Design a protein with these regions (language model features):
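Nudix hydrolase/Nudix homology domain
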Residues: 1-7, 83, 125-226
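Short helix-to-loop capping/linker segments positioned immediately adjacent to catalytic or ligand/cofactor-binding
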Residues: 93-95, 111-118, 133-139
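Acidic, metal-coordinating catalytic segment for phosphate/diphosphate chemistry
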Residues: 10-60
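Conserved Nudix-box catalytic region and its N-terminal flanking loop in Nudix hydrolases
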Residues: 13, 39-53, 62-110
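Short loop segments at secondary-structure junctions
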Residues: 29, 58-61, 69, 91, ...
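Secondary-structure boundary elements
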Residues: 57, 113-118, 156-160
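A short coil-to-beta-strand element that immediately follows conserved catalytic motifs
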Residues: 116-128
Length: 226
């Protein structure tokens, strides 16, 4: 689907351009079955594709979270983890964990303005994968096998305003307070971030000094969520 098609009319030009990038289509066991544009992967009922979520903790063990820009086509303005996006069907990004790490490194620069190689692929600790589906609205959907990565590092950020409108470092109590506000509809939380928090984050926080000890290569099937 080309930029300029009716489904993308009225959206931000930079965001529209990225919707023509090709995602990696997979089955529920994360086996590659093909490729298709981000538009086709997220429109209507969507197509199951790979994604990644990075959790950046500083030396005080506070988690970097972001509020997505209003310009985002799917899930604009919601709060999410440090960085989340998609491996593309290019440049070796389709090569499982290592490919997802390459994609994460690319987006850490493009979204958060982190200096290239300030966070290397080998710094990213793979935790697990989760399969979920969540509607953004009547038009757009997420249906992903999401690779979760953790890194503990102090790093300078310069967020891209076309991607991110706000960032914040939070401890576990502060994050719980944010989620409580979301339960009262005062703020909105990305459904993938809620799944990470509800299923993995407390264990990650408790094991930041031995993070390699809690990884697995399972695909955790979460079903359809709000």
């Amino acid at each position: 689907m080309a930029v300029g098609d009716s489904d993308l009319q009225g959206y931000d030009e930079a965001q529209k351009k990225m919707m023509n990038e090709n995602c990696i289509i997979v089955d529920e066991n994360d086996k590659i079955t093909g490729q298709d544009s981000k538009v086709n992967c997220h429109l209507g009922n969507g197509k199951l594709h790979r994604a990644f979520s990075v959790l950046i903790f500083n030396s005080n063990e506070k988690l970097l979270i972001q509020q997505r820009a209003d310009e985002k086509i799917t899930f604009p303005s919601i709060w999410a983890n440090s960085c989340c996006s998609h491996p593309l069907y290019q440049d070796g990004e389709e090569e499982g964990i290592e490919g997802a790490k390459k994609a994460a490194s690319r987006k850490l620069v493009q979204e958060l303005g982190i200096r290239p190689n300030a966070i290397r692929t080998e710094d990213l600790n793979f935790i697990t994968k989760m399969h979920y589906k969540a509607r953004a609205d009547e038009k757009w959907i997420e249906h992903e096998v999401d690779y979760i990565f953790v890194v503990k590092i102090d790093v300078e950020i310069d967020p891209n305003p076309n991607e991110i409108q706000k960032t914040q470092y939070v401890d576990e109590e502060e994050l719980n307070d944010l989620f409580d506000k979301a339960n009262g509809n005062d703020v909105k939380i990305g459904p993938w971030f809620r799944l990470i928090k509800d299923n993995f984050l407390s264990k990650i926080w408790r094991n930041l000094e031995s993070i390699e000890s809690i990884n697995d290569n399972e695909v955790h099937h979460m079903g359809e969520v709000e």
